[in-house]
Amino acid sequence: MIDYPININNVSGNSVINVGGAFMIRPLTLSKSVFGSGGLNTGIVFENNFVSKAKMINHQFTDQNVTKTF
């Protein structure tokens, strides 16, 4: 498989991402079920098929510089 970066074409108002230029995608899905007003709240359920080809190694030590303001 050729390692090309994924090109995100747009993000619509309901947070649907249109992905173009990807050879194969193995997504992570999220779902939340709520019944009534706070009753039977099961929280967020994560599902993953563990076949993702994404490289999760990050060689950065900090993502954002922290500055103190007075």
Swiss-Prot record:
Q: A Pfam family matched by this chain, by name? A: gerPA
Q: What InterPro entries would the database entry show? A: Spore_germination_GerPA (IPR019618)
Instruction: Look up the domain of life of the source.
Output: Bacteria
Family to which the UniProt record says this protein belongs: Belongs to the GerPA/GerPF family.
The protein depicted here goes by the name Spore germination protein-like protein YpzD
Q: What is the organism field in this record?
A: Bacillus subtilis (strain 168)
